[in-house]
């Protein structure tokens, strides 16, 4: 996570670790399926999204980049368009260059 955080700082796309609370894991359980990806409550979407993804990445290092919030901006930076920002692309490229 530290390498990803540093990459984000280098390209002005900040990220940080968020906990996945056990309650959010429980909300991914379904009465009619193994899992569900939405609990009909519009709060904590990033954390609940990570709780859902966690079921598919057992035993590997992973990160959930929730880009919904920064995907569009009203006051774009010099490298952003006023439409979609592409948030996360620069971060991942910097991380891979490592």
Regions found by a protein language model. Name each.
Residues 1-98:
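A generic structural signal for tightly packed, nonpolar segments enriched in small/aliphatic residues
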